[in-house]
Amino acid sequence: MSEVGKRNPACPIDRIGLKTTGMVRYNFGAAALYEEAIRRGEARLTAHGALVAETGQHTGRSPKDKFVVRDAATEPEVWWDNNKAISPAQFETLFADFLAHAANKDLYVQDLVGGADAELKLPTRVITEFAWHSLFIRNLLIRPDKAELGQFVPEMTIIDLPSFRADPARHGSRTETVIAVDLTRQIVLIGGTSYAGEMKKSVFTMLNYILPQKGVMPMHCSANEGPAGDAAVFFGLSGTGKTTLSADPSRTLIGDDEHGWGPHGIFNFEGGCYAKTIKLSAEAEPEIFATTQRFGTVLENVVLDADGVPDFNDGRLTENTRCAYPLDFIPNASKTGRASHPKNIIMLTADAFGVMPPIARLTPAQAMYHFLSGYTAKVAGTEKGVTEPEATFSTCFGAPFMPRHPSEYGNLLRELIASHGADCWLVNTGWTGGAYGTGKRMPIKATRALLTAALDGSLKTGEFRTDANFGFEVPVAVPGVDSAILDPRSTWADKPAYDRQAARLVGMFAVNFEKFEPHVDATVMGAAPRMQEAAE
């Protein structure tokens, strides 16, 4: 086995049984990986120096093809209602077949770290078949320095082989695509997909399993910090404004997607960003756009014109076009990836029913309720002429990546909020003056003004009213914001229609929360929206 690159000589890849007749390249940097990816025909150079690759059939994650090993250790710990199981024997067969498949391949190895807190970090070795995947994960995770590489011992190992094809009869998979996670041995096998995001989310899944045992809250959120050291976290599902609202030139960006909240404060799990690029423009998001114009960034499924210039408006391959770049490509990004305990927790929703206020203050119990609910609303495809919004509930704002029961994460969050006195806010970036199709989108200027008032502490000193439907507190007046939008009912021309819509949404919350009722206490149940008042 031929091996090149900086590494710990006492820790080769054959320690997990992986041997190959090909070349193993350890910890190559961007320039060398560019050369490899282009030489092998995996990727192309853009006119501005970024690397662009296509993922073929899989242009997003394959959640239905993800499996967790059900063994004696994970049996009582994993939320099996939400995680598909494979047996240890099936995993062993799959693992052996992965090793056999890799036995004649050139491989790329990156020794990286998940978690910017030195006491809680997860040293992770990522072994890939593609050079561009190696650069992708090098951009996304935290890179040790040369001295640390010489001593590096991985705790987690990912083997990523897009050319592998799983056999459902032999491996217990659903299709030829498989993401198999052994939480006990901390091994992840990814086969039959070239979508690079699977690697990133595998590390997130592992940290989501490990950290709660240490009293640390893993969070699917963005985070930033003000000049006075006041940190804020932003929970939110796709399309709610998580990336946009946390990108604030007056605040330091800690990270855009995955964080932990531990004894020393919050910390980024990653060292990079994986941003959506569909319809990306220099005017709307200048910092993200600038990263796509430089050497080192990986573009995924982005179409190039004849001159090699990315066309971010072209979604012919997928609407889920992406760019992956190191965090230090963003001018106001944190150099440490760490911040103090958050002073403010923001839960974002895009309520297309037009019922929720633009901002509301939550008690710790209400925060747990809304965290477990993970509500937003999707707008139906206008091409079908359907204008009815569709409620979406993704518990913990990230159900696909949570191996444990949601109540574990919810209780942890509630305890941390209470012990550190964080203020919690629900921010609605959805519709006002009516539902989708009748009302209009909440003005971003108003959302930013409300957010600024929440983060600088001025909002909580003002006057609040209690919302009749949801029971949370809503500000009555905020400087620079039209007071009318603070009371959603007043913005509707048809008040009885608002009441019916509110009752309907409250009912959806209640039905969704039924599965959590056995796992929460009376205080959290008391924080639920009030069906009777809403229906009156």
Curated annotation (Swiss-Prot):
InterPro entries, per database record: PEP_carboxykinase_ATP (IPR001272), PEP_carboxykinase_C (IPR013035), PEP_carboxykinase_N (IPR008210), PEPCK_ATP_CS (IPR015994)
Cofactor(s) the protein needs: Mn(2+)
Ligand binding (substrate): 61, 195, 201, 322
Pathway, per record: Carbohydrate biosynthesis; gluconeogenesis
EC number: 4.1.1.49
Cofactor note: Binds 1 Mn(2+) ion per subunit.
Binding-site positions, Mn(2+): 201, 220, 257
Class of enzymatic activity (EC top level): lyase
Keywords assigned by UniProt, alphabetized: ATP-binding, Cytoplasm, Decarboxylase, Gluconeogenesis, Lyase, Manganese, Metal-binding, Nucleotide-binding
Positions that bind ATP: 201, 220, 236-244, 285, 322, 447
Family: Belongs to the phosphoenolpyruvate carboxykinase (ATP) family.
Function: Involved in the gluconeogenesis. Catalyzes the conversion of oxaloacetate (OAA) to phosphoenolpyruvate (PEP) through direct phosphoryl transfer between the nucleoside triphosphate and OAA.
Protein's name according to its UniProt entry: Phosphoenolpyruvate carboxykinase (ATP)
Lineage of origin: Bacteria, Pseudomonadati, Pseudomonadota, Alphaproteobacteria, Hyphomicrobiales
